[in-house]
A protein has these predicted regions:
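Juxtamembrane/interfacial segments at transmembrane-helix boundaries in multi-pass membrane proteins
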Residues: 16-43
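Membrane-embedded catalytic scaffold of the fatty acid hydroxylase/desaturase
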Residues: 4-14, 38-142
Length: 143
């Protein structure tokens, strides 16, 4: 239990750094391609977050250095929420880089935080054996 708490606490420390970097990118390097008042920006942000997350997760499976930090997530015998919560304590060092494109095109940090939270809820949902296969469009990519 205490190791699990540590693995959740360490990334929280990295959130401050991420917030500073994301804010700088959003304010100074933003290409301003999006009308942030439009509802479709929220949908685009959610889909873009999912795409960035997909590539981050895929690279963690294909690059040995990243796999070494990610493998703990796959060590459980059962596919459930406690297995999903097994995360590396060092991921905050590089995972944030994968989401920078969102800020470059103009997704505001507030929308990013919201869609990241929604994606986290989705990740809890797909990391359970109680939800069956949902088909290729929605189903789990790594089962």
């Amino acid at each position: 239990m205490s190791l699990g708490l540590i693995s959740r606490f360490v990334p929280l420390l990295g959130l401050g750094f991420q917030y500073v970097v994301y804010t700088i990118v959003a304010e100074q390097y933003n290409l301003k391609l999006l009308n942030t008042d439009a509802i479709w920006v929220w949908v685009l942000a959610f889909l873009m977050y999912d795409l960035c997350y997909y590539w981050m997760h895929r690279i963690h499976h294909e690059v040995k250095l990243f796999w070494a930090t990610h493998v703990v997530h796959h060590h459980g015998e059962d596919f459930n929420l406690s297995t999903a919560m097994r995360q590396t304590s060092t991921g905050f060092l590089w995972k944030w880089v994968f989401f920078l494109p969102m800020f470059l095109i103009g997704v505001p940090p507030a929308i990013y935080v919201t869609v990241a939270g929604l994606n986290l809820i989705y990740q809890f949902w797909v990391h359970t054996e109680h939800i069956g296969r949902l088909g290729w469009k929605i189903g789990r990519a790594h089962v």
